[in-house]
Amino acid sequence: MKNEIEAMITDITTTTAEAEDYTGEDGLLYCGKCHTPKEAYFSKETAQWLGHDRHPAECDCQRAAREKREAAESRQKHLETVEDLKRRGFTDPAMRNWTFEHDNGRNPQTETARFYVESWETMQAENIGYLFWGGVGTGKSYLAACIASALMEKEVAVCMTNFATILNDLAASFEGRNEYISRLCSYPLLILDDFGMERGTEYGLEQVYSVIDSRYRSGKPLIATTNLTLEELQHPQDTPHARIYDRLTSMCAPVRFTGSNFRKATAQEKLERLKQLMKQRKESL
């Protein structure tokens, strides 16, 4: 046992010297590259107790190498965490690449979406959500996914799904209905895409209300995208829809999306590009 302790003390008090290292005027070992100490003296009391007067210390280049290594490891861990959040958080894999960095900047509501991310702590604390409403193809889903991606980059867990997926999951789930909904509501932010497009059956509406109501009671923010108009949301056609819409509009600040249909514009751009390529090929023959 005594030999083991002595070996341990020797190990923690011995510095390995490189060929270019040298002993300074203070008797300590110095790095031959950065010329800073690779040793430091113990206090007098500690030196007497250990029987050694010095211990290894990081020179400047060792410290720089360690910090660089730790930064790389931290970055890799962050990338793996974000990748896992995106894999779990997006039910549609294509949305993983929908980010502010890839945005074309043409949507006037981009600033509103960025503001949500920048103010996340406040939005979370005050339970403030968004209701993106407007015509088809105006960028609602894209900017909602941008918010999700940006928060995931901050290592915030977000779930972006839709009621078609939720209803299918509930029908096929081996876990109980309550457990599934509780898991959905455990996310700091829940995003429901294409709200209002789900089946209008009695069962379907009951499940929609259950999810919305559970989220409301959780006190956590919700973002929803919908093609419904604000008029339709504020004046629903029947009581089941009224219950759902009332909960939704009480949780989310309405944000209107207007303008051209980006999907149609993209399709037109592709068509024009195709015509250009065909013309170039014809001219080259």
Go through the PLM ranges and name each one.
Residues 61, 105, 163, 257-259:
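Active-site donor-binding loop signature of nucleotide-sugar glycosyltransferases
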Residues 127-131, 157-158, 189, 221:
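Residue-level preference for the first positions of well-ordered beta-strands
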Residues 88-91, 96, 102-130:
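Pre-Walker A (pre-P-loop) alpha-helix and adjacent loop at the N terminus of AAA/AAA+ ATPase modules
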Residues 108-117, 148-189, 199-206:
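Short glycine-rich substrate-engagement loop in P-loop NTPases that contacts/grips substrate
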Residues 124-144:
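Walker A/P-loop nucleotide-binding motif
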Residues 1-104, 267-285:
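A short, basic N-terminal segment
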Residues 194-195:
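Walker B catalytic acidic pair
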